[in-house]
């Protein structure tokens, strides 16, 4: 993602740490079940109280401690003194004709993040954000228009799932979030510990119980973290944002490739496959006359040949971003020709189905557009006050 930033000068000042903000309390969603039990015991309660609280949070999905009717007022006071439940505020909801829902949430420090709900044939899938902004350096992506401001806490990541589920709970239609993809704004493995805690929380059988095989984490290619992740024992799916079949091209569109070129990346991927015996999915965004030539498809087939039985390639239509107008979407004919080369080489691949094309579809676009409007409004208000003096 590029170095372009749309922040105004006042926003560039050093930000106050979240935990130093007056009145800040972390979300209780940030605790694992074992940590919640330990905390309850340390505060004079029996272990079963923590189990009751966990059930209120993840099975009954309450939004305040006061709704926990079998918890004493004294213990509720302790909870309120130390935690909040959901730290996010809903700013904008956009619903597409195809059922895709895009949410803009405000964090306790006023920063904005996006979350997307996609209706699939197999259920409801939520795409969560893990960082405010991104420093990875993909030149085609809306997420990196704002540099990374901070990591999200584990509680803030879990809270996205909980608010999306609340959206459907309030509608009363009984629909449940069944799948999660960690593919929103930010690089998940650059916020490794919080993402791992999030995964273990939503996968917990006593809580949301989202199956590991229904969870996918996407990385742009932090090779050392891929190896580390292989040893964590979490059986979730791994996706790698590849987007180019050779180092020269990949380095030109993804800055991370300069640190972890394809040789290092594929060494880590092979280690992951050998360690977990799990398939890896490669994401390949189709950029018109950039990475969509038939020879690029042949290079991609050759690159993945060694791990063909345990790999899969998603060809992704590009969602244009106004700030990156030097890129455009590959034509259907070019995508079809690229796909045909892969299939002739025996590659498992698919052209990804698009979602939410009639709303701010590209990752980071809703947030970026909202920030622009907020700044324009602030400038207009400041100008009006100045003229009124």
Swiss-Prot record:
Pfam families: Radical_SAM, RlmN_N
Swiss-Prot/TrEMBL keywords: 4Fe-4S, Cytoplasm, Disulfide bond, Iron, Iron-sulfur, Metal-binding, Methyltransferase, rRNA processing, S-adenosyl-L-methionine, Transferase, tRNA processing
Broadest EC class assigned to this enzyme: transferase
Protein name: Probable dual-specificity RNA methyltransferase RlmN
Organism of derivation: Streptococcus thermophilus (strain ATCC BAA-491 / LMD-9)
GO cellular component terms given for this protein: cytoplasm
Co-factor(s): [4Fe-4S] cluster
TM ranges: none
Annotated catalysed reactions: adenosine(2503) in 23S rRNA + 2 reduced [2Fe-2S]-[ferredoxin] + 2 S-adenosyl-L-methionine = 2-methyladenosine(2503) in 23S rRNA + 5'-deoxyadenosine + L-methionine + 2 oxidized [2Fe-2S]-[ferredoxin] + S-adenosyl-L-homocysteine; adenosine(37) in tRNA + 2 reduced [2Fe-2S]-[ferredoxin] + 2 S-adenosyl-L-methionine = 2-methyladenosine(37) in tRNA + 5'-deoxyadenosine + L-methionine + 2 oxidized [2Fe-2S]-[ferredoxin] + S-adenosyl-L-homocysteine
Chain sites annotated for binding [4Fe-4S] cluster: 134, 138, 141
NCBIfam families named among the record's database cross-references: rRNA_mod_RlmN (TIGR00048)
Domain Radical SAM core: 120-358
Residues annotated as catalytic: 114 (proton acceptor), 363 (s-methylcysteine intermediate)
Miscellaneous notes: Reaction proceeds by a ping-pong mechanism involving intermediate methylation of a conserved cysteine residue.
GO terms (BP aspect): rRNA base methylation; tRNA methylation
Entry-linked HAMAP family: RNA_methyltr_RlmN
InterPro entries listed in its UniProt record: Aldolase_TIM, Methyltransferase_A, RlmN_N, RNA_MTrfase_RlmN, rRNA_lsu_MTrfase_RlmN/Cfr, rSAM
Task performed by this protein: Specifically methylates position 2 of adenine 2503 in 23S rRNA and position 2 of adenine 37 in tRNAs.
Intracellular or extracellular location(s): Cytoplasm
Record EC number: 2.1.1.192
One term of GO molecular function: tRNA (adenine(37)-C2)-methyltransferase activity
Principal place of residence: cytoplasm
Similarity annotation: Belongs to the radical SAM superfamily. RlmN family.
Region (Disordered): 370-389
Residue ranges, compositional bias (Basic and acidic residues): 371-389
Residues that coordinate or bind S-adenosyl-L-methionine: 186-187, 218, 241-243, 319
